[in-house]
């Protein structure tokens, strides 16, 4: 399955569910309390992060998608902390604030990157479902996906009304379910239980075949569009009616903390589906995202650059020969890491020492070097009959093997203006003894503030001379 980065900026998502605040007390531990055999933590940092449905919305916004959130809080400082964090992240949050009841807070005590204790401050909310529904209905017409983030804390009491309202508008509904009654999610487009939650409904599964069979029965009973079972270190399994099960292995390189991993899965799924991705592609992206987030401490979001880099690793496009879509993805990721992009182009028909020196000098002007190579037809037009000596695939393969070169791409035109307009490199480099104003594409690069450099050629190094010498000896 070929992965690519969706257009998240065109994917508005609404999250409805149980909002909570994840609070962290960080500190050092160097002694045992004289009062009891427990460690003493000297707190030196207090950190608040959105949790539950708020973390789902935060993850969606971190990917670059427009995110809205409807939930229930108390009327207290924890609610203010949540509201401020979400506003800073660009999430449109609408809270139903309940007086004389605390916002749900999960307090974790952390020392040396280890969680020592969790303390929960919570009471199940007894909310007015009609008031919450009114907020949701007012936002439905501007979204592409509705997410029900259910932690069983009382914010969601009218699942069916919300699902039916979204379905009437043709809006997919994704639900992260809780509890032992999944009938409340009847008619959802997709539900995402973890294996424990799934088996609490259908019974223990001896193997994957039994999981698939029981999952198919559950989908039929609940009129579900699809079912995604997340299985920890065993990855995840996607089931759809009348289609073969899709098993995806876990992508985590190192598991550090699984807090909020389910939130990351459903948020990435929602944003990708809202961006128009097919479900298998969206699930593959969610699997990559989950592999990233479990390597972080505590409740965390993944950013668009992090997901881009994971896609690059998956597609093998961190270096080498790329198509335009892959190249733009790689360039976006490099820019997100504040790397300077250098671009040069040429025929590179017979690679020689002069080319190698030139490319090393070009690479030294930035952090990443793109080499654009004329394809065979354009070389023939430029150099005449009998050229190129080497096909474009062979020329690019040799260039990609050089340590100075990050990415190689071919182009069919005689000049690289079209590529330059798409890539917008920070530096355009050419070899020769002419002025900057004579460099093809200089006007394009200079128009957006880029730099144009001309490097001197290495003496007695010429592909044309090499070709003529070989032909003369022949």
From Swiss-Prot:
Q: Which reaction does it catalyse?
A: D-glycero-beta-D-manno-heptose 7-phosphate + ATP = D-glycero-beta-D-manno-heptose 1,7-bisphosphate + ADP + H(+); D-glycero-beta-D-manno-heptose 1-phosphate + ATP + H(+) = ADP-D-glycero-beta-D-manno-heptose + diphosphate
CDD domains per record: RfaE_like
**The protein's Enzyme Commission number:** 2.7.1.167, 2.7.7.70
Q: Which PROSITE patterns match?
A: PFKB_KINASES_1
Keywords on this record?
A: ATP-binding, Carbohydrate metabolism, Kinase, Multifunctional enzyme, Nucleotide-binding, Nucleotidyltransferase, Transferase
Q: Which intervals of the chain are annotated as region Cytidylyltransferase?
A: 343-474
List the pathway annotation: Nucleotide-sugar biosynthesis; ADP-L-glycero-beta-D-manno-heptose biosynthesis; ADP-L-glycero-beta-D-manno-heptose from D-glycero-beta-D-manno-heptose 7-phosphate: step 1/4; Nucleotide-sugar biosynthesis; ADP-L-glycero-beta-D-manno-heptose biosynthesis; ADP-L-glycero-beta-D-manno-heptose from D-glycero-beta-D-manno-heptose 7-phosphate: step 3/4
Broad EC category:
transferase
Record GO terms (molecular function):
ATP binding; heptose 7-phosphate kinase activity; heptose-1-phosphate adenylyltransferase activity; phosphotransferase activity, alcohol group as acceptor
Q: Which Pfam families match?
A: CTP_transf_like (PF01467), PfkB (PF00294)
* InterPro entries, A to Z: Bifunc_HldE, Carboh/pur_kinase_PfkB_CS, Cyt_trans-like, PfkB_dom, RfaE_dom_I, RfaE_dom_II, Ribokinase-like, Rossmann-like_a/b/a_fold
Where are the catalytic residues? 263
Q: Which amino acid positions bind ATP, per UniProt?
A: 194-197
Which Gene Ontology BP annotations are present? ADP-L-glycero-beta-D-manno-heptose biosynthetic process
Which protein family is it in? In the N-terminal section; belongs to the carbohydrate kinase PfkB family.
Query: Subunit arrangement?
Result: Homodimer.
User: Which HAMAP family does this one have?
Assistant: HldE
| Role according to the record | Catalyzes the ADP transfer from ATP to D-glycero-beta-D-manno-heptose 1-phosphate, yielding ADP-D-glycero-beta-D-manno-heptose.
* Annotated protein name in UniProt: Bifunctional protein HldE
> Which organism was this protein described from?
Pseudomonas savastanoi pv. phaseolicola (strain 1448A / Race 6) (Pseudomonas syringae pv. phaseolicola (strain 1448A / Race 6))
Q: Which gene encodes it?
A: hldE
